[in-house]
C-alpha cells in the first residue's frame, strides 16, 4: 500500500490511455519511462470506488498485448533477408518489457487480483487469468511464434549448417533463439515447444548431416584420417551443444553423435587394430581407442585382439632364444622384460593406461611367462628369473649405477608377479642369496634389501622372512668376530699368524647343500678352529656348531714361482696346496689320505688347480719326459709356454684307474700378471644333480605346505566334501604355487593315514576333521 493515496473517483479511460502509451514506449524501446508513476496509476485503478477497475484493466492489457504482438508479426514478415535478427530484436524488447510490467508496473494487480482469481478457481482447472508476464508470453506464442516458426527455424538451421561448414556466423542468434523457446515453454507445464520445435529438428538435421559426411569421408580419405575427423567433429558438436542446446539435450546429442560417427563404423575401426599394432602406429591406436571407448562394448574386441597379439609376439620372441633346454637367464628374462616394457608403453601412450588394457597385458604376460616353449611347465621361468637376479646383484658382472639397478630390479618385481610358482623362485633366490652373502659378492646390502622389500610387498612378510634372517646372521657374525678377537687379546691367546673370521649361520634359514665328505682340516687351521669352538660354546651353551668346510674360503700366499702370489681358494683347494709345504711331489693316493675327500670332490678340486696352472699332473714313469718338456717350454717361451700345462691337465685328469701312477707337483714356472689370483672352483658352481635336488626339495616343501593347509581348512570347517576341499586348497595355495590335483589327493590320503582327518561313514567323498 502506498501512503497518502486515499480512495477516490477516477476516470478509467484517461488513466488507461496514459498507461498504454507508456507501456508501448517500454515495449518498443523508444523512450525511457518512469515505472513508479505507472505503478501509482495502476494502484489507483485497482482501489477505485465505488468499483475497482481490476478486471477492465486486465482485459485492456490483454487486448493491448494482442494488438502489439500482431504489429510485431507484420514487421518481422516484412523483413526480407534478416528474419532471425529482427525476430530476436523484437523478442528482447517484448520480453524485457513484459518483465518490467510484471515486476513493477502491474505488480499490485498481480498480487491483489490476478493471484486471488487463480487461487479461487477449482483445483485442476486452468485459470481464466494469468500473471502479466505469462499473459504476454502466451500471446507471443499463440499470435506470433506459431505463425512464423517455420521461417525462423529455417533461418536457425541455415546458421547451424554454416557453422558446421566452417563459415563465420552470428553464434549468439542461435543461442538466443534457443533461450527464447525455453522462456516461452515456461508458460506451459508440458514444455514441449523447445523439445518438438527445436531439439527434434536439431537432432534430426545432425543425424542426416553426419551420416552423409562420415560415409563420404571414409570412402575418400580412409579410416585413419576418419578417426581424427570424427574426434574433431565430436569435440566441435560438444561445444555447439553448450551454446545451442539446453543442458537437458546434451546427453541425447552425445548419444546421437556416438551412434552415427562410431557405432555404425565400429567393426571397421576394430578390424584395423591388429594392423596398427603390427606397424606400431601409436597415434592411430590412440585415436581408435578414444573413439571406441565412447560407446558401450566398443573396446571388447580390441581387448581380445591386443591380448592375442601380445601373446603371439611374446611366444615368437621366446622361440628365438637359443638353447631351449638350457637358456641363458639374461637373454630369457630380458626378452620377457622387453615384451612387457614394449606393450606397457603402448598401453600407457595409446590406451591412456586404461585398467582394462593393463589387465589384458597382465593376462598375456602371465601366459607368456608360464606357458612357452622353454618352460613347458611353470617352474622354469621362476628359476631363470632368480638366476637373472643373481647376475644383477652379484659383483663381477657389468656394473650398473645404483639408480639404474633399482629401476631394473623394480621391473623384475613386475615380472615376478606373473610367476605362478613363486615357491620355486623363493628356493632358487634363497640359494643364490646365500652364496652372495657367504662369499661377500653382493653389489651392496642396500640393493639386496631393496629387492627383498619389493618381494615382501608382492608376497608378504612370510615369503621373505628367511632372507631377512640371513642378513641378521651376517650382521651378528661381524659382531661375533669382533668379540672373538677381543677375547683372544684379553686372554693373551694366540691362533698363529692366520687372519681368521667366521660366519655363524642359523640352521634352517639358509639354503645350502650339505657336505658329502668328512674333510680333514689342515693342521694349520686346527688351532683357530678349536679356539673359536671353545669360545662359542662358553658364550652359547647348548648350541652346536656344524662346520661347512665346503663353503669356506681362504687366501694363501705362495713362494714356489719367481714371484709370490696371493691365491684366493676354497678350503678343499687349500687343504691340497698345504701338502706341498712338506713334499715336492704328491700322489693321488696321498692327497686322498691327507684330505679324506671323496672321489668326485677330489677330482673336481684337483682339476680346478690344474686348470689354474698351479699344479701339474703327471705319471711317475713319465717324470723325465715331463720335466724336459717343462724346461724346454720355460727356455723357449719365457713362461708363455704354460698353455702346454693345460693340455697336460686335460689329458691327465685324476681317476681311480690311474691312482697308483698319478702324481702332482706345483708349477714352478707359474706366471700371472696379477699378484692376487682368484682360483675358480667347480664345487661352488651348481651341478645338474644339485639342481635336481633343489626341485626335489621344492616338491617336499609343497607336500608339507598342502598338508598344513588341508589341516587348517578342515579344523575351521570340521567337515567338507571332496570337491570343495580341493577347490579351497587350490585357492589357499595359488599365491605360492599352482598345486596339481593328484598331489592334493595324495596329501589327503597321507593325512587320513596319520588320522588328522577321516572319511564320513557312508560318504566316501566327505571328510571329517579328527580333533
Swiss-Prot record:
Pfam families: Cullin, Cullin_Nedd8. Residues 622-667 are annotated as: Disordered. There is a cross-link at residue 715 (Glycyl lysine isopeptide (Lys-Gly) (interchain with G-Cter in NEDD8)). Pathway: Protein modification; protein ubiquitination. InterPro entries: Cullin, Cullin_CS, Cullin_homology, Cullin_homology_sf, Cullin_N, Cullin_neddylation_domain, Cullin_repeat-like_dom_sf, WH-like_DNA-bd_sf. SMART domains: CULLIN, Cullin_Nedd8. Keywords: Developmental protein, Isopeptide bond, Ubl conjugation, Ubl conjugation pathway. PROSITE patterns: CULLIN_1, CULLIN_2. The keyword Zinc does not apply. Residues 626-643 have a biased composition (Low complexity). Residues 701-762 form the Cullin neddylation domain. It comes from the Eukaryota. Signal peptide: none annotated. Neddylated; which enhances the ubiquitination activity of E3 ubiquitin-protein ligase complexes. GO terms for biological process: negative regulation of sorocarp stalk cell differentiation; protein ubiquitination; ubiquitin-dependent protein catabolic process. GO terms for molecular function: ubiquitin protein ligase binding. Residues 644-654 have a biased composition (Polar residues). GO terms for cellular component: cullin-RING ubiquitin ligase complex. Belongs to the cullin family. Probable core component of cullin-based SCF-like E3 ubiquitin-protein ligase complexes which mediate the ubiquitination and subsequent proteasomal degradation of target proteins. The E3 ubiquitin-protein ligase activity of the complex is dependent on the neddylation of the cullin subunit. Appears to ensure that the proper number of prestalk cells differentiate at the appropriate time in development. May govern prestalk cell differentiation. This is Cullin-2. The lineage of its organism: Eukaryota, Amoebozoa, Evosea, Eumycetozoa, Dictyostelia.
